[in-house]
């Protein structure tokens, strides 16, 4: 962890329940640890023990592929690529025919931008196995990771530049020369590592013969994942009891988000609470996330933050009320706890992170086309 792990302020989530699923008038808990996870779900699905064993074994096998030794190689093993060519929903269905259990096992698909007819079992298993091994929350916000990384970079002779937008990646004789910053300053370098969306990275590159136009067109044509509508509730002091687990609410029988079917609606959401300060037992901030595609805010595509107009504000208020209605449906009557509300849409993600379409997870990883992953080196 670059020597920062012992400097981070984190809190271990409840081992008995780190994720709580509300589905079809019932509550299901994800417990930490592979055996505990299986035993906990067996209380709700007593006849599914053997199938749950098979499921746990499957996600564990993927988890073994993302060890440090594997990741240092820079590429997925052939076994890993096989899981990329396997449907998440299909794999779950092959493990159990119980529809309720299928949906409970897929209930946290928001964590990887899950799409029922596209998402890979690799994504599903990698995320779920990681949480089963250990689940934590930051107690002082995630910004501390950035600050500690900055300290490490500087301690090793590096420089971190703020307010510096890379506006061009310089190429000469098929070799990287450096980057242009803010359309004026040139920083020379032998290597450029970009964590931008591949489409953005390619748009910054000088013309060259190494990357073919057909490849660029292919990358531009790839579908991006949905974005996120985020509702941040600032709670009144000592009003909202802290819960040391995430909460997933699902109002439909099928927990997978569907672009066409759910457009304009809020069938599901994830709820996460900020760890209280000091010895308080009450949270001050509740964050609620629900999927949203850029299509829903496309009429404001050409606007900038704080200048989107009254119609945009009204749109966000209506979405907020949809979410609060979903919460009330499951017994979370928090309206009288709320002091202030802040919201973000895929437009916010686009403008502050530069990601295409305000996507939360970048290019969709489609199990039907695993070869695409080798092209973009994911």
Language model regions located:
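N-terminal FAD cofactor-binding segment of flavoenzymes
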Residues: 1-15
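Beta-rich nucleic-acid/ligand-interaction surfaces
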Residues: 162-177, 181, 343-355
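Mid-domain catalytic core of redox enzymes
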Residues: 137, 167-281
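A glycine-rich dinucleotide-binding beta-alpha-beta segment and adjacent secondary-structure elements
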Residues: 100-112, 332-376
């Amino acid at each position: 962890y670059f020597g920062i792990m012992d400097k981070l302020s984190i809190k271990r989530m409840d081992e008995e329940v780190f994720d709580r699923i509300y589905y079809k008038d019932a509550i299901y808990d994800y417990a930490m640890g592979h055996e505990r996870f299986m035993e906990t779900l067996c209380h709700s699905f007593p006849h599914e023990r053997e199938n749950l064993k098979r499921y746990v074994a499957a996600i564990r096998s993927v988890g073994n592929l993302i060890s440090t030794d594997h990741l240092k190689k820079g590429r997925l093993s052939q076994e890993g690529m096989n899981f990329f060519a396997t449907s998440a929903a299909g794999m779950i269905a092959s493990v159990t025919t119980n529809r309720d259990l299928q949906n409970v096992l897929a209930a946290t698909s928001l964590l990887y931008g899950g799409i029922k007819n596209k998402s890979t079992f690799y994504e599903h298993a990698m995320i779920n196995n990681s949480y089963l091994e250990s689940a934590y929350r930051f107690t002082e916000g995630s910004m501390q990771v950035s600050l500690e990384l900055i300290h490490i970079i500087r301690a090793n002779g590096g420089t971190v530049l703020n307010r510096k937008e890379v506006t061009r990646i310089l190429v000469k004789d098929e070799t990287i020369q450096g980057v242009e910053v803010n359309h004026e300053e040139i920083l020379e370098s032998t290597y450029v590592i970009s964590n931008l969306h591949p489409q953005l990275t390619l748009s910054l590159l000088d013309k060259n013969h190494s990357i073919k136009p057909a490849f660029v067109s292919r990358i531009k044509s790839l579908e991006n994942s949905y974005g996120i509508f985020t509702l941040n509730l600032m709670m009144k002091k000592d009003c909202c009891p802290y819960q040391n687990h995430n909460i997933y609410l699902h109002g439909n029988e099928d927990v997978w988000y569907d672009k066409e079917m759910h457009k304009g609606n809020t069938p599901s959401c994830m709820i996460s609470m900020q760890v209280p300060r000091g010895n308080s037992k009450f949270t001050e901030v509740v964050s609620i996330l629900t999927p949203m595609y850029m299509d829903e805010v496309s009429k404001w595509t050409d606007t900038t933050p704080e200048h989107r107009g009254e119609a945009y504000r009204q749109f966000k208020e209506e979405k907020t009320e949809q979410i609060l209605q979903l919460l009330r449906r499951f017994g979370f009557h928090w309206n009288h706890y709320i002091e202030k509300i802040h919201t973000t849409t895929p437009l916010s993600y686009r403008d502050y992170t530069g990601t295409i379409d305000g996507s939360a997870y970048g290019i969709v990883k489609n199990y039907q086309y695993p070869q695409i992953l080798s092209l973009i080196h994911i």
